[in-house]
Amino acid sequence: MDKLSIQSGGPLAGTVVISGAKNAALPILMAGVLAESPFVLTNVPSLRDVDTSCKLLRCLGAEVTQDGDRITIDSSRIDHFVAPYELVKTMRASILILGPLLARFGTADVSLPGGCAIGARPVNLHLHGLEQMGAKIEVKEGYIKARVDGRLKGAHIFMDMVSVGATENLLMAAALADGVTVIENAAREPEVIDLANCLVAMGAQISGIGTATLKITGVERLNGCDYRVMPDRIETGTFLVAAAVTRGRIRCENADPSSLESVLAKLEDAGAEINTGDDWIELDMHGKRPKAVNIKTAPYPAFPTDMQAQFCVLNCLAEGTGTITETIFENRFMHVPELMRMGANMELEGHTCIVHGVERLSGAQVMATDLRASASLVIAGLMADGTTLVDRIYHLDRGYEHIETKFEGLGGKVVRVK
């Protein structure tokens, strides 16, 4: 099994090109099922989860071709409506096939999902919303079995809690429903906006995009389109934090500053000079050690949970004491014991991590426990004396495209080893 070997070096410096957003690409790939003509997606990152999504679509009978960052989907021959356990167990986003299959074909059997081990992430919001639209659903033998006679019906859905995945599933289902669907307390994440914009390009009628109330007037058919996936804001944030921790200066190209305002504000609080353009972000620490910051995760536009682990590392090496409070997922501090093995001074109190900054960490063999935690360990290794060996990096490969190559391009000593 591959590992990453990391050695400390100087400050990161240079330019990194940001990949397309995994969390936008996955739902948009599933939306290809809704199209009655070929659908072309560009700026798609080369990731394990993307490959799994393509396998799932092929398993249903769709024709999928991958050419670099371009994926073409022809769903006209879909004749199979089961998303099997073998594929779904490795990727939570597989649940997003449920809405499109049910809306277009009236039937879907989807295995209960797997993916990152960071808490329950219940699917009941997805199921309850689809039931309000007329679906008959039972969970049996590890599968969600959903059926509808004719088309789904428009409904007024109030979501008990903000859920990105449930918003996306219901948005896709409503696009082909009969009548008007209103989703209240909808997620406002940029990736939800990207999916909605893609659906509009396919012929969907959606208003309120980017707000907490989405109104979808169902249409009888959706067509394929050419669509470019938004830049990955979490990858962007990860490289910016790595540069801040190493007291460096970097430029992120193919980035979207408007999707990262809460993160950029915290980096400025930490002492970084930030400059932005339409599609680039520059960070310069001027050789200074970052200052500790206080973080509280919450749904967009507040601070993203997917950047929490990276800021834990920033605080580990910062001047002063900072607190990180996690409000989205339980069990999302699994990186803390690994960082403590490297010499971090941290303590957990419920959903809050109190971090006292130290000058340097010590290299150690550590284990990645989930996608973003593994990125935090790589950043820690860049400021640790000796060698850091990160095990279980298949988590990293699920969400970061060629991460070691990109770090090497910035001067980081990060090497993949067997």
From Swiss-Prot:
Cross-referenced InterPro entries: Enolpyruvate_Tfrase_dom (IPR001986), Enolpyruvate_Tfrase_sf (IPR036968), MurA_subfamily (IPR050068), RNA3'P_cycl/enolpyr_Trfase_a/b (IPR013792), UDP_GlcNAc_COvinyl_MurA (IPR005750)
The enzyme's E.C. designation: 2.5.1.7
Pathway: Cell wall biogenesis; peptidoglycan biosynthesis
GO molecular function: UDP-N-acetylglucosamine 1-carboxyvinyltransferase activity
GO cellular component: cytoplasm
Active site, renumbered: 116 (proton donor)
Residue list for modification 2-(S-cysteinyl)pyruvic acid O-phosphothioketal: 116
Catalysis: reaction(s): phosphoenolpyruvate + UDP-N-acetyl-alpha-D-glucosamine = UDP-N-acetyl-3-O-(1-carboxyvinyl)-alpha-D-glucosamine + phosphate
SUPFAM superfamilies: EPT/RTPC-like
Role summary: Cell wall formation. Adds enolpyruvyl to UDP-N-acetylglucosamine.
Name of protein: UDP-N-acetylglucosamine 1-carboxyvinyltransferase
Highest classification ranks of the organism: Bacteria, Pseudomonadati, Pseudomonadota, Gammaproteobacteria, Alteromonadales
